[in-house]
Amino acid sequence: MTDFVVVGGGVGGLVAARRLVLAGRSVTLLEASERLGGTVTSHTVGGIVLDAGAESFATRGGTVVALAKSLGLGDDVVEPLAEGAWLQPAEGAAFRLPENSLLGIPSWPLASDVIAAIGFRSAFRAYVESLIPAPYGAKSVTLGELVRRRMGSDVVDRLVNPIVRGVHSVDADELELDAAAPGLRKALLRVGYLAGAVADLRQTSARAGSAVAGIRGGVHRLVDNLGSDLSRFGVDVRLGVSAASVEADSVTTADGERIDGTVIVAAPGLLGGGTAPGRRVVLATLVVDEPRLDAAPRGTGVLVADGAPGIRARALTHATAKWRWLAEAAEGKHVLRLSYDADAADDVDLAEIARADASALLGVPLDPSSTVDFARVAWYRPGRERYTPNGMLVVGETIAGTGIASIVAQSEALAGSLVDDSNG
Ligand SMILES: Cc1cc2nc3c(=O)[nH]c(=O)nc-3n(C[C@H](O)[C@H](O)[C@H](O)COP(=O)(O)OP(=O)(O)OC[C@H]3O[C@@H](n4cnc5c(N)ncnc54)[C@H](O)[C@@H]3O)c2cc1C
């Protein structure tokens, strides 16, 4: 009998297991695959070790930075280079994303970069909400609903949606407001209008430094070090063991073994409790040798609006223009990460498609001979649980939403409450 059985060794499960073992509890962790880390992992492309999934994390709340410090990675937390990202709209040329914005919501709708992006009429429509400060829209459930009500559809469709799809692979109308932009609802209630709420939140995060950060050498180092800590602290980590069914106080593995203990589910999709449909995402990584990219023609990358003609990618990250450590490791070559919805990446020569998309998005024709290496990684992300069966403890993306920052915070909080409760 173990005190806790954690099912799933992604970042959610690893953080929970570490918190529990550090509080003196016995922990068994079951991981279906042969490695820890889940969606946070690495691969080697063109001789460079790169993140094959998540490559950065939100700094809000300071939770991930605190975790990195406790894992001995404090000196390796790095901010991205300040080049900014671009947007490829459905029609017309790419433009630099408005500087003072949050998930595409402008803090000053009449700024010249907002007008350049959506036109004066739509920018003025967005500005008007500041003339009528009121909590109107604050009860909105989704991010899209709130922004549409306050600032109009053009801000949602042309600025917010391309960004939200790039990060979360869903539309702003499908994304819960509090998960997408923690603190925005409260700021709106306090300030009275959305642009002001965005300015308020931006000011807070500016005081705290960049909104996102990475780890020198790659974010996968977080899960590598979490895994090492679990071994060091005596967690019984079982790789290649899949949970077939879970109860609140026991797990039955696919091999029929029953393991008793308080169960924490950290495996998205395992409970299947009224989930939204899952989605497949494909990440294409190109390492290219093309000196014309040294000037970072589209800053740190390009988000792609739905319907951009001839482009299948959802987003492109110019990773060597985003991370100094990576530019140094690449020794003059460039690393481009393009994300695709699976249906756009199935049954095609993805290396060729990615090269064509990168050429169009970066405005620099990439000759086939410039490609040093290419890698394709397919991910399946189960839908978010709408509810969890009574009494089940759940951590990770299933319940915290997409992103390392939300997951680490939720997992730490839940595991902490369990040991605090039983201590009291
Ligand atoms: C391409 C891509 C890029 C991303 N980029 C970023 C980014 O830059 N920044 C960011 O913050 N987030 C990013 N994300 C999202 C982030 O990686 C995830 O939200 C997070 O890693 C999910 O962690 P998790 O522990 O909840 O789940 P997972 O990482 O999915 O881990 C769950 C684990 O459970 C295991 N498992 C499943 N079923 C069972 C079972 N029955 N029994 C035992 N084990 C089981 C799985 O094998 C897996 O190891 C990205 C995601 C993708 C796909």
Predicted regions and their residues:
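Mid-domain catalytic core of redox enzymes
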Residues: 89, 241-348, 361
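Glycine-rich FAD pyrophosphate-binding loop
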Residues: 21-45
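Conserved flavin/dinucleotide-binding core of flavoenzymes
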Residues: 42, 98-101, 315-424
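Dinucleotide-binding Rossmann-like beta1-alpha1 core, especially the glycine-rich loop
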Residues: 46-134
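N-terminal Rossmann-like FAD-binding beta1-loop-alpha1 element of flavoenzymes
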Residues: 2-29
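Short loop/edge segments at beta-strand edges and connector loops
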Residues: 8, 79-81, 237-241, 247, ...
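Active-site/ligand-binding neighborhood in enzyme catalytic cores
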Residues: 123-244
